[in-house]
Amino acid sequence: MRKGKVIVISMMFFCILIFIAAIVWFMMYQGELTEPTSEEKYAAILHASGLLKSDEHDKKTIKNLYQRYILARKVNLDSGEWVADDVQTQGCKKLAPEHDPAKIHQRCTIADVYLVKDKSNKIQQIILPVFGEVAKSVMYAFLPLDPDGRTVENLYYYQQRETPFLGARVEDESWRKQWPGKKVVDNNLMPALRITQEKPENIDEYTVDGISGATLTSNGVERSINYW
């Protein structure tokens, strides 16, 4: 019996060491992330849309899929109107803290939006770039919405530096699978998404169960999505 307890304690100690080693590795190498290349960004958009199912695709395949099914547009965030593709990103302004829930520090008037077409060129999704500062880093994601502009079809984080096994679980399929069908705005088109850590009895269409042990990351995800 005593031998069994020793084995259990040894295994627990070993797991703790592995966890600490992972955290140390993360802290040492988190600064090495660089701005994603065009191919990486294209791949992330295709993953978010569901057109790309795995990472085992060459650059040519990614480029062909992107050119065939993705239509990049620019939108004026102040007016909500489409603008010409050759309009440069202008009019960036600093944000006061009380008007900067996503902690992005400045916002540009012109932003990119990606439309996903089917084979008959009918729009199937509207993909919004979402980013904001959370617990450990600025996280970048693509948020595909139904053409109604309210209903989530997926949430795909493609660059983040959150703590392994905690905030970094924003990329886990087990957490992401609850997003399809959620609403990001209410019937009055006001931001309404909630991410809760309290595991409510009834999770409605506006509520997502947060990541256990990663309250700051969960709150940051909520703020950044509601901002954009």
Tell where the protein language model's regions lie, with residue ranges:
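Flexible, solvent-exposed loop/hinge segments and secondary-structure transition points
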Residues: 2-228
